[in-house]
Amino acid sequence: MSQMELIKKLREATGAGMMDVKRALEDAGWDEEKAVQLLRERGAMKAAKKADREAREGIIGHYIHHNQRVGVLVELNCETDFVARNELFQNLAKDLAMHIAMMNPRYVSAEEIPAEELEKERQIYIQAALNEGKPQQIAEKIAEGRLKKYLEEVVLLEQPFVKDDKVKVKELIQQAIAKIGENIVVRRFCRFELGA
């Protein structure tokens, strides 16, 4: 594959600009996988720079499961109404709503979880490890690992994305920020399930 074909392929796969793709490929010695990783890292850095900008515009994304027993509303914010009308942004809102319907997170971010709840979970995991005969230090390390797994179950941003489990939801949003060039924030969501 020629260099131009590789650049084109990565642009289509990542949505990054041509010069960004070319630089990443050069820095990665024209190794496709390393270049994708570099683009993801650089996208995360761009996202971090934009994270403190205020996002007041946006849309309410929605999803109703085909059996009409589960529905989701998600508020996705951006900085301008121009971006709110962007197809990529609207598709992100729809994908997030579908993800929430399937994965049933309880919180948007880990910061929303009450400290008492986290500590309660941590103590349960420590006690379970101690009951298995593990020493206190090992039990605490085991508890930290299980707590991380717990966060992946209940926190939207920490969950593996339902359409691509190699990517966490927060990484998906960072990729969208890098492509769109504006801060994007999941403000809140509401999931309805018939009979629940």
UniProtKB/Swiss-Prot annotation:
Could you list this entry's UniProt keywords, alphabetically sorted.
Answer: Cytoplasm, Elongation factor, Protein biosynthesis
**UniProt KW Lyase keyword:** no
Q: Where is this region: Involved in Mg(2+) ion dislocation from EF-Tu?
A: 80-83
Any one of the GO CC terms: cytoplasm
CDD domains in the record:
UBA_EF-Ts
Q: Which InterPro entries match?
A: EF-Ts_dimer_sf, Transl_elong_EFTs/EF1B, Transl_elong_EFTs/EF1B_dimer, Transl_elong_Ts_CS, UBA-like_sf
Question: Where is it localised?
Answer: Cytoplasm
Q: Cite the SUPFAM superfamilies for this sequence.
A: Elongation factor Ts (EF-Ts), dimerisation domain, UBA-like
Which PROSITE patterns does the annotation name? EF_TS_1, EF_TS_2
Q: What GO molecular-function term can you cite, just one? A: translation elongation factor activity
Described purpose of this protein according to its UniProt entry: Associates with the EF-Tu.GDP complex and induces the exchange of GDP to GTP. It remains bound to the aminoacyl-tRNA.EF-Tu.GTP complex up to the GTP hydrolysis stage on the ribosome.
- Record-stated family: Belongs to the EF-Ts family.
How does the annotation summarize its subunit structure? Heterotetramer composed of two EF-Ts.EF-Tu dimer complexes.
Q: What is this protein called?
A: Elongation factor Ts
Which organism does this record belong to?
Answer: Thermus thermophilus (strain ATCC 27634 / DSM 579 / HB8)
